[in-house]
């Protein structure tokens, strides 16, 4: 699966420890949290606490794995196609942008009084 993600330049990978999969992002981004909604649209509900985790039972079949893999790939492709992973901003660039937006909102709020 990670090979396909890399080949398609999708900025994520999946690591696992037996029955726990962790969705990791390979590039900084401020909208990674939205991936859970793309997964849900593909029929895969994932609770989102920091990096996403999928828990599977020990009797998970190869067919079940293929369904999850397909949902993850379709969701990642859709998120990329929608432009949420465009750009090459670094983590510090993103922090600066968010800081400027917050400062602007505080100034705008004070001026609106």
Predicted regions and their residues:
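Conserved PLP-binding catalytic core of the aspartate aminotransferase-like
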Residues: 2-38, 58, 101-109
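PLP-dependent enzyme catalytic core of the Aspartate aminotransferase-like
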Residues: 42-113
């Amino acid at each position: 699966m990670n090979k396909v993600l890399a080949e398609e330049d999708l900025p994520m990978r999946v690591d696992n420890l037996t029955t726990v999969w962790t969705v990791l992002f390979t590039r900084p981004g401020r909208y990674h949290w939205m991936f859970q909604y793309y997964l849900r649209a593909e029929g895969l509900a994932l609770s989102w606490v920091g990096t996403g985790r999928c828990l599977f039972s020990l009797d998970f079949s190869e067919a079940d794995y293929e369904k999850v893999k397909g949902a993850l790939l379709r969701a990642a492709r859709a998120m990329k196609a929608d432009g949420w992973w465009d750009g090459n901003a670094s983590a510090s660039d993103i922090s600066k942008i968010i800081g400027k937006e917050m400062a602007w909102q505080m100034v705008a709020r004070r001026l609106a009084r």
